[in-house]
Amino acid sequence: MSGPALTHIDSAGEASMVDVGDKAETVRVAVAEGFVRMKPETLALIRQGNAKKGDVIATARLAGIMAAKQTSSLIPLCHPLMLTKVSVDITPDDALPGLRVEAMAKLTGRTGVEMEALTAVSVACLTIYDMAKAADREMEIGGVRLVSKSGGRSGDYHRAGEMR
């Protein structure tokens, strides 16, 4: 069987942390996205700042940033990283209806930051759900995916059809 290999599996088929010691340090950036679909009334509550637990968007933004910094504690084979930047943008979308979440993680180092960006989006979405669940238990988290990455030996990646 040819094609891409799983980098976290050793020759014996066991899970193994990748040795990045010989890789060059380069600027690495990853962007991920996701959404929380909800009832229009729930979105209105959040926009007005009337959710029972407080400012949903600000809290979810902070939760996403904190989560990116803790990725190696949550995902077993991720390296602890010295992130230089994490941003989480949360945008209301009436057409969804709900909130769109985008995270960017950046560093200068020997391994990528895709998992950090994905973790930031995931935890921000979970925080939105937690803070608004009293008003809407039918919320749906979805669309969590890598949008783009740059830097490193494998080169740049941009999801087809995305302009970033």
Curated annotation (Swiss-Prot):
Protein known as: Cyclic pyranopterin monophosphate synthase
Family: Belongs to the MoaC family.
Cited function: Catalyzes the conversion of (8S)-3',8-cyclo-7,8-dihydroguanosine 5'-triphosphate to cyclic pyranopterin monophosphate (cPMP).
Positions annotated as active site in the UniProt record: 130
Disulphide bonds in the chain: none
Enzyme class: lyase
Residues engaged in binding substrate: 77-79, 115-116
Coiled coil stretches, renumbered: none
The species this protein was found in: Rhizobium meliloti (strain 1021) (Ensifer meliloti)
Gene Ontology process terms (BP): Mo-molybdopterin cofactor biosynthetic process
UniProt entry keywords in alphabetical sequence: Lyase, Molybdenum cofactor biosynthesis
